[in-house]
Amino acid sequence: MKLYVFNPDADMALGNNEENYMAPATIRRMAEDLALLPIWYARPGSGVLAPSAYNADYLKQMQQLFRLDVHLVTEPELPDYADVRVMPWGWNPAIRKRMLKGGVLERNLPTPDALDKYRMKAARSNALAFRALFYSNKIDYTCGDGCCLVEADGGTTAISLDIIGRYKEGCVFKSLWSGSGKGLCWCRHGFTKNVSDWCSRALKENRGFVMEPIFDKVEDFAMEFYSDGRGKLLFVGYSRFVTDD
């Protein structure tokens, strides 16, 4: 059986990379409020990890309306599902420890070495290669020119000169791992001390960050894909949302 877990702090936890990571209160609240989100994409016969107190009635209503073949699993019940295949929103050392402590068999969880490889694949820096590919092949309706990776040995002085020379309209710095609108530093008024401090922290903590122009965007959306783990990748839909910036 598959057990789905909604952990919206997944990318932030990857940035921290510690098994005892604790997300900010607002993100923890989001995880609680949206714990049943996986019922809409879980495979039939699966379980969804969520507190029962205020989720059971809602799930029952949705099951009646949409004939959803999923059931609720609470944290205290995890030992009864020790042999499940955990399907989190995203893997990181913290969710691995949480599942292991809850009673899931270790053989059903990714190894620390596998998590290290997963972390590197999840970094924003990997997206730069795709952007460059789209740009070099002149694929219509894509952007990517002007985006770059700043690494630890570059220093903030080089970053400052790069901004002055290339980003007349300002730029945005992005942590290699972050989520829910976190990990961004907007540089609209020059390389100020606050911007410099942010860059220094990012270089110290993650040894790099992504820098890109502030695009004249129309709206925000993400493309969602599913990988079966055997080389097959499927496009499953869009995630459209609204942001302040």
Indicate residue ranges for each PLM-predicted region:
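Phosphate-binding site of ATP-dependent enzymes
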Residues: V195-D244
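Conserved N-proximal alpha/beta basic substrate-recognition cap immediately N-terminal to
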Residues: I27-Y41, L49-I159, S178-G179
